[in-house]
Amino acid sequence: MARLQQSFQQVTLKNLAIYRELNLICQAFQAAEVPLIVLKGGYLATAVYPHIGQRAMGDLDLLVPPQQLPQAATLLDKMGWQTKRPYTIESRLEHDLHLPKLRKVGSPFEVELHWNIVRPGQSNEMLPDALWPHTIPFSSAGPAASAFAFHLQLIHLIIHVAHNHQFSFDLRSLHDIALLLKKHGESVEWHRFVDLVQKWGWQRHAALVCCLICQI
């Protein structure tokens, strides 16, 4: 029990540090007029979980429009978020969905700057511009921050589990989805969920994840 309590306290302190930095990032992006979507744990820890210490985060995932990626990367660099790994924006846009992990001296976490939620060149590729109409305000991160609307949040979590990580995950990933449905299931616009899953070709992934969720 003591170890669990210690772990809970450590996660809580780390997440509080993440949210402090997230608010600073949101302020800088707002001043520069760079739209920002908070992804995965950065949203779920306060919007879905009962307590901020119940959802561990290894990094902070953020998404910006691809055309503003250079500006966003420069802003983060000025705030101390940097990588020693050489890269070019053009190459990353062509082959990946986020920049190399960014680290800041003294920070216990990393930042991943995304412009999409799937890699380019796949049969069920999603254009980044198609994501932005499906957002909601996320006040925990700041007045200008957004998160995916519940139907797209669910799709993203399904893609993250079933496609990006090929079901190589711990139970936290499924727990994220189960809690999202428990807390916000009635607010999910299911017709939009079905339309987008069919449009983007994620039916099989969604069915597999839903079968697993039903057994939790």
Segments predicted by a language model, with ranges:
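Conserved NTP-donor binding/palm subdomain of two-metal-ion nucleotidyltransferases/polymerases, i.e.
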Residues: 1-58, 64-216
